[in-house]
A protein has these predicted regions:
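Non-catalytic substrate-recognition/targeting regions of SAM-dependent transferases
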Residues: 118, 122-176
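A short acidic, Gly/Pro-enriched loop at the edge of an enzyme's catalytic core
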Residues: 254, 423-432
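Short loop/turn segments at strand-loop or loop-helix junctions that form parts
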Residues: 169-172, 291, 435-438
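Generic alpha-helical secondary structure signal
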Residues: 164-169, 191, 195, 219, ...
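Charged, often flexible domain-edge or linker segments that flank or initiate folded functional domains
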Residues: 1-140, 179-422
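Active-site loop signature of alpha/beta-hydrolase-fold enzymes
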Residues: 176, 294, 440
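Catalytic P-loop NTPase motifs of RecA-like helicase/translocase cores
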Residues: 259, 440-441
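Amphipathic alpha-helical repeat scaffolds
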Residues: 266, 431-440
Length: 441
């Protein structure tokens, strides 16, 4: 387990490390023994609510190659939810030293990611697979549980931001992937073409880029971030430029939801002071996606000289989504467009209360088409989409609206923001691509 000397901050609080976090919050800790049965009871209460059962099914879809009983699957899901809650709270205390009040409103903003978006960290926490505590019947009890965890965390100083802080907890609670063996996880040939392979031997230089396509809890990524940051700042680079260039240079993905949550948290902590003061909006370049197979182009959607279209499975029977290449190639465009959709989804739901469902859907699709086809000055994506790309996005949006009307959750947006990562990562050239991660489960 990574470990460093525990220190004390100027405020007199202990600066935790990976080992002390395991001691305080690991499987043998009083904190876990109190939180786990409460979380499990809350889940049992709402697991048949459609949006909760959907998140659980989607999470289960990422557990490929593992044969567990239904009881063991639920137990693991609750344990991973526990660690994901800790990650959110640690990140909040890293970015804001003020105490967490315990109010439901504040804790909800931490759980669903609104707090981090207000800090200009757009995608750190999305409406992911661990936000089931937002379900109204358990929201207040879930917030009380988070407040108890926050009170336990308040004894520590997280401002220093030890990057591998949560790695030990991840190793304790997350099962080792069946894909990993003593030989590590080989890099698929289609992605190896994106850059020189690196067998975790050396860290990138200040001007080199690195991709870790099986990033696990992010140990190699955060080491790369630290090396690039130190080298750039030592040679006098501007802090804003350093932040933006690091985010472009060090990127990763993983097919395990908790791994991505921990890797993003570790990446955030590794950025340190670059994100603790004012900075422009940023995306943390760690994505929930897999690389076992190349991205699939849907030839049936492509007509003549039209643009390429990629198909993404949902994990639900018969449900697939299509994204035009111009959107799939651009993580900023992905985040921006899908980040606008919650307003349209809610609008469709509100319209159905006063008009025919099909009329409501078409009205919202017309409004979104107008947005896609119009110039968007003073935004990250000022140019309108082509007519063909807009049509593809509208078909996907219609599917999302119909899903939302049945199960009002934004979890699909989380999936679709992340799934195209192999597309936009494969089309650029990284200086180094990590082809083994046997040291990082």
């Amino acid at each position: 387990m990574p470990d460093g000397p525990s220190a004390h901050s100027h405020a007199g609080k202990e600066v935790p490390n990976a080992r002390s976090m395991v001691s305080a919050f690991g499987p043998d800790s009083p904190a876990f023994h109190q939180a786990y049965p409460e979380l499990l009871a809350l889940f049992q209460h709402v697991k048949d609510v459609p949006e909760v059962s959907l998140r659980f099914r989607l999470w289960r879809g990422y557990q490929l190659g593992v044969d567990r009983s239904p009881e063991d699957e639920e137990a693991l899901y609750i344990k991973e939810t526990y660690v994901a809650l800790l990650a959110r709270l640690v990140a909040r205390l890293f970015l804001d030293v003020s105490p967490i009040t315990g109010e439901v409103t504040e804790l909800t903003k931490i759980l669903e990611g609104e707090f981090f978006q207000a800090q200009n960290i757009t995608n750190f926490i999305e409406d992911d697979l661990f936000t089931w505590l937002l379900c109204p019947p358990v929201l207040n009890q879930g917030a009380a549980l988070m407040a108890t965890l926050a009170a336990s965390l308040s004894h520590y100083d997280f401002v220093i931001g030890v990057p591998d802080l949560l790695t030990g907890l991840y190793e304790e609670f997350a099962p080792r992937s069946p894909e990993i063996n003593a030989d590590g996880n080989p890099l698929p040939g289609w992605l190896a073409q994106s850059g020189m392979t690196n067998d975790i031997g050396s860290l990138p230089g200040p001007d080199q880029s690195v991709l870790d396509p099986h990033c696990g809890s992010g140990q190699f990524l955060v080491a790369a971030v630290g090396a690039i940051k130190q080298a750039r700042l030592e040679r006098g680079d501007d802090t804003y430029d350093t932040l933006l260039l690091i985010l472009d240079q060090a990127q990763g993905m993983d097919s395990r939801p908790l791994a991505v949550t921990i890797a993003r948290t570790s990446y955030l902590l590794a950025l340190g002071g670059l994100v603790q003061s004012f900075h422009p909006p940023v995306l943390l370049p760690v994505y929930l996606s897999g690389v076992a197979t190349p991205p699939v182009r849907d030839l049936e959607q492509e007509r003549g000289d039209s643009e390429p279209v990629y198909e993404f499975g949902s994990g639900e029977p018969g449900e697939v989504f299509h994204i035009p290449e111009i959107v799939a190639h651009d993580p900023v465009m992905l985040d921006w467009l899908f980040g606008r959709l919650p307003n349209y989804l809610r609008g469709a739901l509100l319209r159905t209360r006063g008009q025919d469902t099909e009329d409501a859907i078409q009205a919202v699709l017309t409004a979104f088409h107008n947005y896609l086809a119009a110039p968007k000055p003073r935004t990250p994506i000022p140019d309108p989409l082509s007519r063909f790309a807009a049509e593809v996005m509208l078909k996907t949006t219609e599917s999302l609206i119909r899903l939302y009307l049945n199960q009002p959750t934004n979890v699909w947006l989380h999936i679709l923001k992340n799934a195209p990562a192999p597309v936009h990562m494969a089309q650029r050239k990284f200086d180094l691509v990590v082809d083994r991660f046997s040291a990082d489960p």
